């Protein structure tokens, strides 16, 4: 957690959908969605590795449905934009290899119960949720605007505004803070994959105009703001040809950009019985409602589970000193308002649906997507009542 006193800088990064790790995340979540569309009670843990000319799918899936892995992988890669062999990764010609087993019976016996309500957690672990008043989405400003840059970088590629761009890319935004509030953008960093033969000067001016200045709030940029674009001077080789990509390697990008804590669990490719995903979504939902209720400027929620046990082993809600009530009162209110057993989380947030592929890039939180139910603020009144405010 960052300080609430003095002047300091905080930086977060985002990546585009063509980044190799995000290619892997999107493939994993596309497979998850294909299965949940047929079998909402499926158990899915799907991992993906992508490298030059190959995608490898592995994991454990127990379902009554069927997923055409070959077609899903190729369609996902094509949609991202890897459609030419000179990129080293082509939707139509890459090898697709799969090795899928059923969910372990040892895990299944801890999750499955005679009644859905008593469903145990799919694993042990701790999950965190965070919210703050820095942006309208109640997200930290650095990650919020880093994602805006990444989305814009993809947009100007796909609509051919900058038709020489390729799918891979990364962004980074450093904010200057004063007494806990973001006051200006100090630095912007962008790496954008491009066709061979494009001059660095053109790339810099185009991206500065079409991406940076078009995405970031003008009042936060001043003459001292530094903008770095493709600082090696060349970014032609990228995507899975440039780096091997794996599911679950962008967990800070997926959450709060390093602000607040992270339990370590990844999201993509996991059905909601995995509390790595559903627990983190619920923690965000709670934290966002705490802030939206005016109970705190910042809120962080931790929930922890034991495998096979429905009730969490611990729950903590903290305002990091910004609250209208004590952390003890806040935590008690959270326990009163929210049922944190896995089945009830899935029911309250309606998670057993094919909604996950859009979450696999540009962040799981702070998004204006009606399917992202964990972004609703419909528990505000209940929390205020429980806190006796």
Swiss-Prot record:
Compartment(s) of residence: Cytoplasm
Domain of life from the UniProt record: Bacteria
EC number: 2.5.1.6
Entry binding sites for K(+): 47
PROSITE patterns tied to this protein: ADOMET_SYNTHASE_1 (PS00376), ADOMET_SYNTHASE_2 (PS00377)
Pathway, per record: Amino-acid biosynthesis; S-adenosyl-L-methionine biosynthesis; S-adenosyl-L-methionine from L-methionine: step 1/1
Record's catalysed reaction(s): L-methionine + ATP + H2O = S-adenosyl-L-methionine + phosphate + diphosphate
Main localization of the protein described in the UniProt heading: cytoplasm
Location of the region described as Flexible loop in the Swiss-Prot/TrEMBL record: 103-113
Source species: Maridesulfovibrio salexigens (strain ATCC 14822 / DSM 2638 / NCIMB 8403 / VKM B-1763)
Pfam families according to UniProt: S-AdoMet_synt_C, S-AdoMet_synt_M, S-AdoMet_synt_N
InterPro entries: ADOMET_SYNTHASE_CS (IPR022631), S-AdoMet_synt_C (IPR022630), S-AdoMet_synt_central (IPR022629), S-AdoMet_synt_N (IPR022628), S-AdoMet_synthetase (IPR002133), S-AdoMet_synthetase_sfam (IPR022636)
Positions contributing to ATP binding: 19, 168-170, 234-235, 243, 249-250, 266, 270
Cofactor mode of binding and number, as noted: Binds 2 divalent ions per subunit.
Record-listed Mg(2+) binding positions: 21
Subunit structure: Homotetramer; dimer of dimers.
Protein name: S-adenosylmethionine synthase
Residues holding L-methionine: 60, 103, 243, 274
Function according to Swiss-Prot or TrEMBL: Catalyzes the formation of S-adenosylmethionine (AdoMet) from methionine and ATP. The overall synthetic reaction is composed of two sequential steps, AdoMet formation and the subsequent tripolyphosphate hydrolysis which occurs prior to release of AdoMet from the enzyme.
Cofactor: Mg(2+); K(+)
Class in the EC hierarchy, top level: transferase
């Amino acid at each position: 957690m960052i300080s609430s006193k003095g002047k300091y800088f905080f930086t977060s990064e985002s990546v585009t959908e063509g980044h190799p790790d995000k290619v892997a995340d999107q493939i994993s979540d596309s497979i998850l969605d294909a299965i949940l569309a047929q079998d909402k009670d499926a158990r899915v843990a799907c991992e993906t590795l992508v490298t030059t000319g190959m995608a490898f799918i592995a994991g454990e899936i127990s379902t009554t449905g069927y997923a055409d892995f070959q077609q899903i992988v190729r369609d996902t890669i094509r949609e991202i934009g890897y459609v030419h062999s000179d990129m080293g990764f082509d939707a139509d010609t890459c090898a697709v290899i799969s090795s899928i087993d059923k969910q372990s019976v040892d895990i299944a016996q801890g999750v499955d119960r005679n009644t859905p309500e008593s469903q145990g957690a799919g694993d042990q672990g701790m999950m965190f949720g965070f919210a703050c008043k820095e942006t309208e989405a109640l997200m930290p400003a650095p990650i919020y605007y880093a994602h805006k840059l990444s989305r814009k970088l993809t947009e100007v590629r796909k609509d051919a505004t900058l038709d020489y761009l390729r799918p891979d890319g990364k962004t980074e935004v450093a904010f200057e803070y004063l007494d806990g509030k973001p006051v200006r953008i100090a630095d912007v960093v962008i790496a954008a994959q491009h066709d061979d033969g494009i001059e660095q000067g053109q790339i810099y001016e185009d991206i500065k105009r079409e991406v940076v200045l078009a995405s970031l709030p003008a009042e936060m940029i001043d003459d001292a703001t530094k903008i770095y674009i493709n600082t090696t001077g060349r970014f032609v080789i990228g995507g899975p040809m440039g780096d091997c990509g794996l599911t679950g390697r962008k967990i800070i990008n997926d959450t709060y950009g390093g602000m607040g804590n992270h339990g370590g669990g990844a999201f993509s490719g996991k059905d909601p019985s995995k509390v790595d995903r559903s627990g983190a979504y619920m923690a965000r939902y709670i934290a966002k409602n705490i802030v939206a209720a005016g109970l705190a400027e910042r809120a962080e929620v931790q929930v922890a589970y034991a495998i096979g046990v429905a009730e969490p082993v611990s729950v903590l809600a903290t305002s990091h000193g910004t609250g209208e009530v004590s952390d003890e009162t806040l935590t008690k209110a959270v326990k009163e308002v929210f049922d944190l057993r896995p089945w009830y989380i899935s029911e309250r947030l309606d998670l057993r649906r094919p909604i996950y592929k859009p979450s696999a890039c540009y962040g799981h939180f702070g998004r204006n997507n009606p399917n992202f139910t964990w972004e609703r603020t419909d528990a505000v009144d209940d929390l205020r009542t429980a806190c006796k405010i």
